[in-house]
């Protein structure tokens, strides 16, 4: 009974979080409607073949041919049997709440656990949870369908809470939280977010080290570090299956280093990703003010005409143009919304820089500054280059603007440390805080500054800036039309362009200044509440409640701009993202076991609708196989353009298209159908008579020394009768034998991870398969293992002897079984350590 009474207030806070999460998504969550997300729908299209196979066999294949000619599923459906335990723990943690609702609930609960680890009172911890959880970016990524990122971010605060507890001497609970949430965090499978938060962990550990050195408590520091390290290692090993195969896949994906020596080598990083690609989404330097004023750059890249309030200032003559122009005018290619952490939160953060003392403040400030500087990417390139070239793994991640998740953590945390000190300091306004003013006679001199002065200064630096921006917007932000927009509008006659630009600036200035005033009044209201509490005109608990309501309403309203009820659809709309068309039905009448489809009526390499029904040449995935991407750049994309022109010229008569010369690479990929666009949004499927089929013998195999030679040789070969391979595969493939027209290869059985063929040849030789090569594919000929080689830059090949043979290609990596065994062992060790720790703690308390 005492235990229940002790934890009842915490349980009530948890219940409050669930109510808030439900309320945000009301009424959609009660009506059964769900979000239609691009990334989630794309994932459904890419994963349809996996789903069908799993439902039919109960086994999860590690390969799919649904997109990009074929690729591993390690970063599409990273599901392993060892994760079922973690899945159960995760569901318990978020109380089996429905989709979307539990994301917000987990945000709130995670930061609450962190602040309780920092020894915050419950009401302050609940307030702090709102400040972190309702940061705009966290809701924007829910709307976008970046669910792995959502889950990873939700588990990071409680993971850090374990570290905090350990360094505060609470080793058992520190071990439990660190181990458990490290495992859950890694299972979320968003390495980029985990990697970014390790910067926070690094700075915090340094802060604890400095504190330990000052207090001469290095033994305690070492013990806490060991506890965290062991717990983290167990959490990592529990996820070894996922981590190992992610690492393995990274080496072969766009995130790994290319074997090509590119002409523009300076633009290439050690990871293989180009600097331009990594920094394409870089936050603007002046765009950083969105932390304080969300519409500093207009918000999201949605049509300007959708903003009814702003369109009140629009010249009706330009209305059609405003339907094409975006509301966002920053220098990113596009955005789903800004990073806004709350106006009053920023005041508390600035106040914390002045009144919070100790190494932790400097750790949080350093992490914040680093986050902002790195988010600028190409706008602060010399600094970005330092990290790309010298910081391990940093160059493996694109969209550098997303590193602002660090600032979104450190700003509310320091803000809450400031508020905690304000409310817990007796007569705070009359008190002082020392200010380091500089050296005097070789000694540092501190000057005592009244706390009310720090509060006033913080108000001026935040609310004052909002007023200055609102009154003089063009002084601080001269550009309200981006350079890209100016280039796009350059074709408009000058007599129309000048008034258009003037009116566009007027509209956007009104959008910006309205939000400036909004942020000002939020800060003003929060400051008034705080001052009333400090003057004892308002009880602290009521002040906290009012600040809770103020910050929740402020950030709720901003988030509703980017994640609102209008975005929810009936479940059936998302569950079947691509309705079967007449074109699909016509292609599906082909009962051949395996062939590919090229959709020229869509954005071929940015959609998975085609993959839902067919095995696509294109697709959508953030980390496709690197060699396939290089083949796209060098051959597939140009051949697509040539195919469009040739087919149009032949008026759709494929027999009149010189397919062998126009698109040989598409032919070797067994592109049997090409979907062409028609007027009125209709499409038509055209059968390609030149596709090479599932496999064929080649008469000649040329060996080369490197990737550049291999890729270049493709254009010089008759790919139906010749092939090129890296010389490292010579032992596996041997020499090709000229065939005499009687060699036959038939596909007998198709599964995503197993292909069975009958091969007949009087001479034997090298068989090329129209299947994408990847380490881990194995082959047997009449039940005996043979080595699989790589030809034509991306395809599989084997050497067979004369006669008739049964060939089986299989993708069932032995590494899955090995890593699963290690994961179960780690589970056992973690469970034993937790049980032992709890028993030890109970005995210690009794003694």
Short names for language-model regions:
Residues 97-111, 337-352, 407-416, 518-527:
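Hydrophobic alpha-helical transmembrane segments
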Residues 223-283:
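Polar, glycine-rich mid-to-C-terminal structural blocks
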Residues 20-114, 130-153, 267-341, 374-384, ...:
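Membrane-interface coil-to-helix junctions
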Residues 10-46, 231-245, 370-374, 466-471, ...:
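Transmembrane signal-anchor helices characteristic of membrane glycosylation enzymes that use polyprenol
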Residues 347, 672, 681, 721-847:
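Active-site-proximal, structured, solvent-exposed surfaces of multi-pass membrane proteins
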Residues 54, 65, 69-72, 78-79, ...:
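Extracytoplasmic/lumenal acceptor-recognition loop(s) of multi-pass membrane glycoenzymes
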Residues 115-134, 172-175:
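Transmembrane-helix signature of polytopic, membrane-embedded enzymes
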Residues 129, 145-156, 166-183, 191-193, ...:
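Contiguous transmembrane helix-bundle modules in multi-pass membrane proteins
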